Amino acid sequence: MPVDTKRIRGPEESQSPLLFLSPDKAPKAPSSRQGVRGNGDVRPVFARCGLVSQAKGSAYIEAGNTKIICSVYGPKETERRDETDMKTGRLVCDFRLAPFSCVKRGAWIQGSEERDLSATLMESLRPGVCLHRYPRSQIDVNVMVLENDGSVLAHAVTCASMALADAGIEMYDIVLGCTLRQSGNACLVDPSYAEECGSWQEGYGDNQGCVTLALLPNLNQVSGLNADGEMREDTLTEAMRTCMDGCHKLYPVVQQALTRAVKKKAPPPEK
């Protein structure tokens, strides 16, 4: 059997040796972020709907330097071989990072990270969409990250949910996302790219990781949860509560953007 001789054979999962340093030898991680924003504050958000004229619905969102645009196409008829699946619609999500969006230039071909993010995005959005109202139909959600400055998955969930609402897709509730970076006993809500992958990732000891949560705010139900790293159970529970609070902080901005889009599409009053 031919093998790849240039591939470095290593374990499927590995941990940083810095995690096993004794507390007295480990350097102290920062307890607060730099600047005027507090640890529990989200970045200022700019949101608009209906920017892509060719799509059934679209949305654009900015959170700091993170910029994401989403387009929704459908529902369109689809043929399936499995008769049991024809009673409900199908939600297809495509998550892509623009080659110029990250510090290191990427490729147009979708990589494994983008495929994983696409699957997580679909799992987060599906509980909020009334797929039973669209039998034998398919709804395509295309997300493009124009600039990655952290918390892209959470803001992609919010942007895609706004685009679905702008397209007139029936939903149980809007879906909002929030990310938290945990470092020891301190946490950062809506972290930037530097906070996700910079000095904060060099923390030591336990309770190190990131948590991304998707929430249906009116129903107060969690539709998606993605956690990386190693955290205690009580720390993870508190991180989820903090992310839920962050989602509720975004809700007025999203509601205002959707209201503005509806008023713009509404026909003028008859004289």
Curated annotation (Swiss-Prot):
It comes from Danio rerio. It holds the Pfam family RNase_PH. This is Exosome complex component MTR3. Residues 1-39 are annotated as: Disordered. Disulfide bonds: none annotated. Non-catalytic component of the RNA exosome complex which has 3'->5' exoribonuclease activity and participates in a multitude of cellular RNA processing and degradation events. It comes from the Eukaryota. Residues 1-12 have a biased composition (Basic and acidic residues). Component of the RNA exosome complex.
